[in-house]
Swiss-Prot record:
Top-level taxon of origin: Eukaryota
Alphabetized InterPro entries for the sequence: Acetyltransferase_Enz, Acyl_CoA_acyltransferase, GNAT_dom
Chief localization: cytoplasm
Gene source species: Schizosaccharomyces pombe (strain 972 / ATCC 24843)
Entry keyword annotation includes Nucleus: yes
Lineage: Eukaryota, Fungi, Dikarya, Ascomycota, Taphrinomycotina
UniProtKB keywords: Acyltransferase, Cytoplasm, Nucleus, Transferase
Any one Gene Ontology molecular-function term assigned to this protein's record: N-acetyltransferase activity
Family, similarity comment: Belongs to the acetyltransferase family.
Subcellular location(s) of the protein: Cytoplasm; Nucleus
Pfam families linked: Acetyltransf_1 (PF00583)
Protein known as: Uncharacterized N-acetyltransferase C1271.07c
CC terms in the record's Gene Ontology section: cytosol; nucleus
Amino acid sequence: MMKPSNISISAVKLPQDLDDFKMLVQEYLQEFGMDLTFQNVDDELANPMRKYGPPHGIMLVARDEHGTALGCVAVHPFGGPGCCEMKRLYVRPESRGLKLGVLLVKEIIQYSEKLGYSSMVLDTLDTLLPAVRLYKSFGFKTTEPYYHNPIPNVVYMRLEMSK
């Protein structure tokens, strides 16, 4: 089993990084079988930099020592000044159990603070118990819906970050 010390997490900068991010998001969509057309996911995949790119957003990819993409996460501005939304946290099934989710969430929060955000929102499904527990371990609390999501059993969460 890989050790976290053999894992690197970096911002998407190169074309290969972007291709890997898109591939991971496509795997995420296939695994969970959700219809996210209401989120314009096709446009998002066609040009992720438009939604998640600098200067106000960021995409991160976790890799092993061989450069294989293992997971991803992104953030973009959402809902007013100082607020961002975490999206597309995904770890490949064969890489689960390595605490990659913890590492990715920690990194995206740190990057978001550097970008000047003071709060972060996200939505997940109540059936994804490991994800809900992970978010709560970072201080996320359930909150009122911040947009309309037609998928049943959605949990909306918010984190007030240190300034």
